[in-house]
Amino acid sequence: MKHPIDPKQIPDNLIRLISDDWMLVSAGNTDRWNTMTASWGGLGCIWGKPSAFIFIRPQRYTLEFLEANDTFSLCFFGPEHRQALSLAGSRSGRDFDKMHGLGLTARDSGGTVVFDEARLSLICRKVYRQDMAPGCFTDGALISDFYSASDYHRMYIGQIAACTADEE
């Protein structure tokens, strides 16, 4: 059973949750949506509001959905869904039906898509986006290590509008 929680009460280690356990970033509605696995991002506070920060490369199909919609979701799963997250991160929704291929149950919530199987879901209202620029890096090694194709991430900031978690 899902219940709403205050984002400040998320019981997990946020660095482990995002970088090790991964998350699905989704945008759209159940008529037309896409999701992708991400391990780069963060949660915190900006402009006095609990917020999420995600980073999406320009070639990712999910970027089109993030641009076209005002909300997006971040969904976190238990280890039993690791294979679905691996698949969502390795196959593009341009040529793979993620609705049926991931084995997850998508539903509309708060203007975007979440998954019934997620143990934690954040619905975020998009408030800011900006492309990373090579001239802004203070550590040039990051450019050679991560951006040899000059495919710099676009950062999105979303204010957390709703947060639901499984009952403990």
Spans of features found by a protein language model:
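Active-site-proximal mixed secondary-structure blocks
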Residues: 1-38, 42-168
